[in-house]
Structure formats: structure tokens, C-alpha cells
Amino acid sequence: MAAMAPGGSGSGGGVNPFLSDSDEDDDEVAATEERRAVLRLGAGSGLDPGSAGSLSPQDPVALGSSARPGLPGEASAAAVALGGTGETPARLSIDAIAAQLLRDQYLLTALELHTELLESGRELPRLRDYFSNPGNFERQSGTPPGMGAPGVPGAAGVGGAGGREPSTASGGGQLNRAGSISTLDSLDFARYSDDGNRETDEKVAVLEFELRKAKETIQALRANLTKAAEHEVPLQERKNYKSSPEIQEPIKPLEKRALNFLVNEFLLKNNYKLTSITFSDENDDQDFELWDDVGLNIPKPPDLLQLYRDFGNHQVTGKDLVDVASGVEEDELEALTPIISNLPPTLETPQPAENSMLVQKLEDKISLLNSEKWSLMEQIRRLKSEMDFLKNEHFAIPAVCDSVQPPLDQLPHKDSEDSGQHPDVNSSDKGKNTDIHLSISDEADSTIPKENSPNSFPRREREGMPPSSLSSKKTVHFDKPNRKLSPAFHQALLSFCRMSADSRLGYEVSRIADSEKSVMLMLGRCLPHIVPNVLLAKREELIPLILCTACLHPEPKERDQLLHILFNLIKRPDDEQRQMILTGCVAFARHVGPTRVEAELLPQCWEQINHKYPERRLLVAESCGALAPYLPKEIRSSLVLSMLQQMLMEDKADLVREAVIKSLGIIMGYIDDPDKYHQGFELLLSALGDPSERVVSATHQVFLPAYAAWTTELGNLQSHLILTLLNKIEKLLREGEHGLDEHKLHMYLSALQSLIPSLFALVLQNAPFSSKAKLHGEVPQIEVTRFPRPMSPLQDVSTIIGSREQLAVLLQLYDYQLEQEGTTGWESLLWVVNQLLPQLIEIVGKINVTSTACVHEFSRFFWRLCRTFGKIFTNTKVKPQFQEILRLSEENIDSSAGNGVLTKATVPIYATGVLTCYIQEEDRKLLVGFLEDVMTLLSLSHAPLDSLKASFVELGANPAYHELLLTVLWYGVVHTSALVRCTAARMFELTLRGMSEALVDKRVAPALVTLSSDPEFSVRIATIPAFGTIMETVIQRELLERVKMQLASFLEDPQYQDQHSLHTEIIKTFGRVGPNAEPRFRDEFVIPHLHKLALVNNLQIVDSKRLDIATHLFEAYSALSCCFISEDLMVNHFLPGLRCLRTDMEHLSPEHEVILSSMIKECEQKVENKTVQEPQGSMSIAASLVSEDTKTKFLNKMGQLTTSGAMLANVFQRKK
């Protein structure tokens, strides 16, 4: 042992707790385990330095015994291995130790070593092979080595009394087959029936060994459990402790269970049985019949009555409460001294010692009051000078200074510096956010945190402190930005700093100590958690220690090194670890002030800005936002802003740029330098154009609302920010005549949409009634659906205004002003009505109505705008401007011009963005009437139907509007004009997708059947695409049969034989819906009828009509060629139809004929392969070559086609 100890301790002391590489950690753990095994071999086997079997430099025989014949080779080897006198001890391998144990038959010690190695994951082959071989445990003759003659003391060797070797139990017996867990269960004791006593003794020895190990395990678990129960405090109770300063210490789980047990015992003893039963039910997780259920290794205390009687025998010192608004004059203090010496008899107690103790307490209180008076006078003097300075500089005096909540166990009573409440017990205006002229003593108390004042220590202790300890405890002041953000908005903005104190460690980090005494207390709390975990990647446990030391250390170089360790503590910190580090950095910043934050923390961030690991760069980005409130204002708007700008432009990790955006948002909540406005705008545009969706989302949630708040304060929201975005949209539309950049349009428009809440808040705050908005009486409730759901708390209008109550009052006055008094003198609202809305409507008219994405974006924008500004504003300000432009009247129909405004995107955006904002009956009627008028006017003027189609597509995406759309279409079905009926028939196709089958069956099918028998052929033909869509989307058998019969009548009725347009529409519909329709419908109806149409087209005389039909047949066959077609169908219909089509193309379009020949050849090859009856999935080499050659020719010919791409759009369409 003496030889081993230095090695063990030296290696243990060489572990670097700040080492971040996991491989090095594994090596250290492995080395530690190996040394532990060696030490356990000596210590666990009952050796001591004075025993005959101990391993000492004086005993050259390392692992032998005094009774064993000496082996020179072994003895010298062991002596060299374990070290001799004056020599450096050499490292002994575990395999050599195992070999020696097995050689000397110390089998239980070898078994224990084997078990330890298995638990550490390093199995030794020698021990594994030995204990897995049952033959090693058969009966043997003779005396085992290391076993002297009976009665010789001290002959146990390594397997002495501590090891409890079974071989010593019988004085000379042999060890039976009980060497390992794997062979113990299969031990056959019946084989040794010749000596029952020896067998019993050996069995007892083995069981005793296992029992001893089990007892040690149980004892260790009990100790750990008791320790955890004594120290851990639930999070909720810690929160209650923080909010209830009168509670001296939070209750622990162990204490709670013990008190529950005593209370229940008291109730039972005093016959409160029903109360006891109820109490037990409410604490069903505890067994009240067994004290051991409360806590292991804990003695049961006396009952409640005994505790109460015993409490009466103790003196309880009252709390020392000091009215900080009062003081003690020196002459009064001097007069108190003789009074103390002449105390009245009522204060005397029978014990002189207690009398002297009371005198000593009073003297200490006098000293305390003197010191408090001295400190307050010093504070008054300093505050007077600061007030004079601030008055000269025309600055407002901050009523409250940021401070950290002090540790609760360090104060006699809790103050409320953080919340701004005055601790004076005589004050009655606590918590009111009003302007109060503080007295000098009040200002001193509200500015200096209680734990920072020198009166926390008696005068005798202060006099013994070094000067630095007192001078270092100065009030920490932070630069307050000259901003007007509401507290709710400010709090919501800071919520994006990802810090955490909702854990034991987070609680320790957030309340780092600032005095010598509290450092020691904190070390006592944290060290028990650090020691067992620091080698198991729990290095965040070190954060409180590092921060406390960095906060209080007098040497700048050492502080810099500690902060460097903090930022490099974890190689790749995860989300929780980063939050813990950020929490510590903020606590550090609150204590040390802005100067040290700039000088000590920011350089650490700068060093990591280009680190190779994104987790480190993420920590830098998050820390910039978290530290923003604690930095000098000049640094916020210069260095930190530049750091974040660099990371936004250069960093390739999406997560890092997302954190940069959130930190930029926090910076925008504190920056007050107007010169940085345009730099912020450029950063905003860069963030909006970021390729990562995460970054763009963070921009809308944090950066944009914070920047808008600053813009509002500068007066630039309407005059610059919104106008600039509108101008960029207009420029995009002017330049995008040949191809609009829809991504940029979405970028700018979504930014405008995110600015709507800020714009509405500005309108409310600058309204004529804003000065009347006072909270008094009952506050009206805001409807839950009054505003659209915000993307983040910063886009909530109530957050921007300050509170939901204040917003409710403003909304009530807002609606009244719009209804009764108008907008005269209301500049911010007049700007919206007279400038913003006309410009937006003009932009809407320039959008391509066929761009579904653009129509949808502008529709959502107007919907949010109208919902935010309210129903009265929408009805009186928005709708009239649209109606003035659209002018829906049948008298104004211009058949030549097509009533141009109705063909633009203004129609769908007005219908879906404005008229759908509110869903009352009158609103729905207005929407139905508008769509009916548009459908009528477009039909009668022979104008394009794109605007109406866009409206139906946008509304049809929401099932809530399906009934409304069918109402509009039924109006068209029964209209007197065939043009309107034809338009209604075509609109059915757009409404069917996503519609329920029940609605299709009850409302759509009857309307289509009515139109299919219309006197006008054009109306009948217009129903064919809708019938095809039903075949594609519906699975109801009866409905499909009705549609099939209607289509069959179109194809087989003689009156339609010469209807070229009808045949063209049917072929186009078959090509569109065939691949997606039901297979039976496709095989039995579509393909056979296409074959018939191809045959009839061969007889067509007019070449133009023949080519038209052939072209549509080619597209239909190309789409159907990708579907599975049975052999019979291929032979009887598909191939004959292709051959008929090839006949047409030979004369009319030779380039199509080549492709058709390749398709026919490939289909024939498929049929031939099936007739050969080859195994499924296999194909001959020749067939494979032919197929590849066919594909190549087909693709080459496709590339040489001169026809439009639209004709071949469905060539490679697969069946869905």
C-alpha cells in the first residue's frame, strides 16, 4: 500500500477538470478505475501495514504468505512490481495481479476483482476463462497454497480475515464449484454427500460473502437517498420561498414527510380518527404506519406534544427590525449606556449569564445603529453630489437602480429592490408606478441594495476587513436608454434572452455572491454537487464558482483567465448549458457594472466569434443580446451592433444567424442613437432575404417588431419604413412585366403585414382621445377574435400599448370616434386612409391575376389589415375605396374592353381579403352578391374569367365557404343568359376539389345534370370538365355511375356526332383525369371510347379538325401509357387506338408519327414478353436492349418536336 499510494494520488491529482476532449476524459476514467482495482486488492482484502500478509517494502514476498515455500523468481518479481525501499514504484498490470491471485488460490478475491472489472466494462480474459470453466472447481486433494498447518496463526495471506475465504472455514478443506455468478446456480452440493459438514460450511461462506456485498450496497443506497432527501428542495417551494420573505427557510421533502407523520400520530392519539383518515388520503404517497417510510437512517423524533413543551424551554430571539427612515442621535446613544446598566428588575432573569447576554446584545445593537447612521450619512453626501451633477446635466434621476435579488439566507429580512418597492415599513405607496419626490434618506435606501450596505456587518467585523472589501461594494449603475417602450413590450422583448433559473443550478447561478461570507456559503452549497460530477461531463456545475471568483478576484489577469475558462468550459455546449452560461454572464454583469462588462466579458465574445464549432458561435450571438441591458450605450450601438452584423453576413449556420437576429431585436429595444437607424434598416432587409426559414421567422417575431417600436419613437414608421417597403413592391411590379420575382414580393409584403400591429398602435396612441384614456371603473372586455393571432408577443397590440386593460379603453374610444366624431385632426389615421390604402389598391391592380401566390399574399395582408383596424374602419374606409374602383353595374358593360378592372387581381383580393374579414349574415350576403355580379358582368362582356377563377380557388381552399360558392353557382345555373350559365358550369370544376362527397351528391351533381340538358350546346360542353373532376375525386359508386351515364350519352347520342368542340373537350378531360381515375372506369370506359374516337377521326375530311382531335388524342394516350394496362385491353383497344392515331399523324404531323411508332413498338414488346410467360420481373438481354433502344429513340424524337410544350405536358405523368 505504501508503494501504491503515491501513484494513486498523483494520478488523481493530475485530472484536469477543464479538459474538454471526451477521449482524454475516458482515458482518465479508465486509469482511475484501474488504480482503484489495485488499491481494492490490498485494502479490501483485510491488509494493514502491520499484518503478516501486508504489502510493504519490508516484506519482499508481495503476494505470498509466511507459510508458503518461497519462490525466488516470484518473490523478486513481486518486489520489483510493488516497489522496494528507495526505488520508484513500477506499474503492476491487472493481468499479473489476477494470475497471482489464481496461482495462490485466492479465488474470492479474484472473483471480486473480476466483478469490479466487469462493472467498469474492462473484462479480463484470464479471469473470464477461469470462472467460466466448471472444471476449475472440482474436488482436489492436498492443502491449497497459502494454507499452513492447522492452528498456525497469521497464515491466511492475502485471503485473511478481511477476505473471509471459504477455504479457511474448515481448516483445510477444498473450495467447491462456487467461483462466479454463472456457475454458482449450477452448483451440485449433492455430489459431496460424503462430508456434509464441510459442504454446509462452504455454502455458508459463499452466502455470507454475497450477503456482505448486498448489505454494503443497501447501506450505500440508503446513505445516498437520505442525503438527497435532506438537501434537495423542489423548485416550486424555492419559488414560494422567494415570494414569501417571512419564511426563514423552505421546507424540505424529508421535513415535510416527518411533520406529516408526527401530525398523523398526534391525531390518532387524540381520537381525531376521521381527520387522520382525511389527512392520510391527501398524502397518499406516504405510509403513516412505518417511520422508515419517512427517511432511512433517521431516528424518530419525539411526538408533537413533547416538541411543543420542549420549545417553551428555549429562548427565542426576536427579529431585529430597523426603520430605515429613522435614526439615533449620538447623545441618545450615550444616554442609553447608563440605562442599560440600571435595568429594571422585570428584565432580570435568575441566571446572571443571560443578563450579561442581554446587555451584550443591546451594546451590539448600539454599535449597529452607529454604523448604520455613519453609512447613511455617507450615502446622503454622495447622493447629494450626484443629484447636483444630474440636475446640471438636465438628466432625470432614476428612481430605482438595477440590482440582483440577494441570497435569501444572508438577510434578516427581504427587501424589494428589483421591483422598485420601498422597504420603509411606514410607506403606504408601495408598487405604484407614479412620480414620487423621494427624501434624501428614501433615495439612499432605494438606490443601495440592502446586502451591499456596510450595515450588514457589526462594526467590529467591518473594522477588521480590508479596505477593498468595503470600497468594492458600490452601487452599480447602468446606462438607461432614452426610450419610451411600454414595460410589457420591454418584458416580452427580454423574454427572447434564453436564460434559465428554473433549476437548482440555475438558481445558484442567478444569485452569485458578492461578499466573502456569501462566497463561503455558496461554496458549501455547490461543492457537494461539483465533486461527484465534474468528471462526468457535468462541468456546468463549475459555473457558479467561476463567476463568483471572477466577480470578486482583485487581479484583472486572473479574472480574464477565469472568464476564458467559463467560455471554454464545455467543448460544444448544448442548449441547456448555453442558457446556464448566459444566466451566469447576466448575473456577473449586474454585479460588476457596465465598465467591467465591456472590458472583461465582451473580449471573450469577440474571441469566439469565428470559432469552428457552431455551438460556440451560438453562445456568442445569444450573449450579445443577453448582455445588451448591461453595456454602455455607446458600446451597444457600435461594437456589439458590428459584431452581430458581421455574424449575420458571414456565418453559415442557420441556428447562429437565428440567434443573431434575436439579439439584434433586443439591441433595437435599447439603442437610442438615431444615426444607426439606416444601418438597422439594412440589417432588416438582409434578415428578411435570408435563405433560411428559421432566420426569416425570427426576424418577423423579434427583430422587425423591435425595430418598428424604435421607428415609431423616431417618427419614421409611416414616413419612411412602410413607404420604403411599398416603393420596393411597386418597383418589383414595374420590373417584373416579363417575370415577377415572387420571393422578393413575398419578403416585402410579409414585412408590411408584420408592421400592421405597430401601425395600429401608433394610430391609437396619436388619436385625439388618447389623453382621455384613463383606467377607471369597470374595464370593457376585448373579444377573443378581435385581432388576428399574432406571430409573437411583440406583435400583440396589447403588448405594444402596455396592457390589455389600456387597449380595451382605447378601443372603446376608437370605435366611438369613428362612428360619431370622424377623423378630423387625426393625422396618423388620415395617412392610412388617404395615402396607404390608395397606394395599396393601385399596387393590387398591377398584379398578375393568374399568379396564385401573389393573390394569396395580398389577400392575407388585407384580411389582417381589416381585422386589426376593426369592422367600423373596414366598412367606412376600406370597402368604399374598392367599390369606387370596381363600380359593378350592368349599365357599364363594355363588350370590347371587357371591363378591364374586373379582370385584374383587385376582384379576388377584395373578395377574399376584405369581404371575408367578418362572417355575420350581412357580410356573407355582401360577398355572395359581389361574386354574382362579377360572374354576370364578366360573362356578358365576354371578358376573361381569370379574376373570378382566382376568387373561387382562394375561397374554395377553405371548406367554410363551399356552401357560399355553391349558392353563387346556382344563381348562374338558373340565370337567363346562356353566357352566365356557361360560366357557372366551368366554375364547378374549381369548387369540386376538397369538397365533401355529400355536398357533391346533393348540390353539385343536380346542378350539372340540369346544365347538361341545357338548350345551348356550349353550356352542355362546359359541364364535361366538372364531370371529369367528379370521376377523379369521388369514390361513391352510385354517383360515379350517374356521371358515367351522362358522359356516355355525350359520346353515343347521335345529336353529338358532329360536335367537334364536344369531342375535343371529352378527349382533353379523359387525358387529364384518366391516370388518376378509378382503374375500372379507365379500363371499361376511357380507353375503349378513345379507341372509338380515334377510329372516327380517321374518317374526318377536314384536316384542321382531324389534326386538332389527333393532337388531343396523342396527349391523352401519352398520359395513359404510364398506367398499368392489362394484356387484353392492350391488344383490343390501346394498341388499335395508337395505330389509328399513327395513321392520322402520318399525313398531318410526321414528327408525332415517329414517337407513336416507338410507343407502338414498346407496347407490342410488352405483349410479346407476357406471351412468352417469363418469370415475373425478368427479361431477356435482347428484350432489354430493344427496350433501351426504344427509349433512346423516343427521347430523341421528343427533343426534336416543334409543337408546343403544353401539348406534351402529360406525357410522363404517372398514376397517383
From Swiss-Prot:
It comes from the Eukaryota. Residues 21-31 have a biased composition (Acidic residues). The keyword Transport applies. It is found in: Recycling endosome; Golgi apparatus, trans-Golgi network. Its main location: other. Residues 1-73, 135-177, 401-477 are annotated as: Disordered. GO terms for cellular component: recycling endosome; trans-Golgi network. The modification N-acetylalanine is found at A2. Residues 148-163 have a biased composition (Gly residues). One of its GO terms (biological process) is intracellular cholesterol transport. Residues 197-231, 359-397 form a coiled coil. PANTHER family: RAB11-BINDING PROTEIN RELCH. Regulates intracellular cholesterol distribution from recycling endosomes to the trans-Golgi network through interactions with RAB11 and OSBP. Functions in membrane tethering and promotes OSBP-mediated cholesterol transfer between RAB11-bound recycling endosomes and OSBP-bound Golgi-like membranes. This is RAB11-binding protein RELCH. It comes from Homo sapiens (Human). The gene is RELCH.
